[in-house]
Regions:
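Helix-loop element at the rim of GNAT/NAT acetyltransferase active sites that forms part
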Residues: 16-31
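Glycine-rich phosphate/pyrophosphate-binding loop shared by adenosine-nucleotide-utilizing enzymes
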Residues: 59-65, 81
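Conserved acyl-CoA
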Residues: 94-110
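A short, internal acetyl-CoA/4′-phosphopantetheine-binding micro-motif in the GNAT/acyltransferase core
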Residues: 81-93
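Conserved beta-strand-loop-alpha-helix junction that forms the acyl-donor binding cleft
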Residues: 112-125
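A short beta-loop-alpha structural element at the N-terminal edge
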Residues: 1-16
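A conserved beta-strand-loop-helix scaffold within acyl/acetyltransferase catalytic domains
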Residues: 28-52, 57, 66-76
Length: 128
């Protein structure tokens, strides 16, 4: 399992994985809109300071997606890194390591991870 920054060629496969994982997530009350997801991923890939991080198995199949951004704090010029969205079947540890590497590369002083409000299958608690 490897994690790295994804590119435009990964968007279709990342969208399919997110759709599959969405069906069993705490977000199922919201309708999954694949066209909107593709548009958002394209924006993330092309925007400086934002990245689509992917975990892929040995066959190159995407197993996890972590959308990340690095920005300045509102109150000072120091930088922080945060996740926008994190969906993963496998390779979560590798994704977090890649996220930490990316944060360091962009000079982030702090990493802030969002935690889902609702975790019906207790996956988040088991992961962390």
């Amino acid at each position: 399992m490897k994690a790295a920054v994804g590119n435009y060629g990964d968007i279709a496969q990342a969208t399919r994985l997110c759709k599959t994982l969405h069906a069993d997530s705490s977000w199922t009350a919201l309708e999954f809109n694949a066209q909107h997801v593709r548009k958002q991923l394209m924006k993330i890939v092309r925007t400086d300071g934002m990245d689509m991080l992917l975990s892929k198995d040995d066959d190159g199949v995407i197993q996890g997606v972590l959308l990340a951004t690095v920005d300045q704090f509102f109150i000072c010029k120091e930088r922080y890194a945060t996740d926008i969205h994190f969906m993963c079947k496998r390779g979560g540890i590798q994704l977090l390591a890649e996220f930490k590497r990316l944060a360091r590369k962009h000079g982030a002083k702090k990493i802030i991870m969002g935690i889902a409000n609702d975790d019906p299958n207790n996956r988040i608690a088991r992961f962390y």
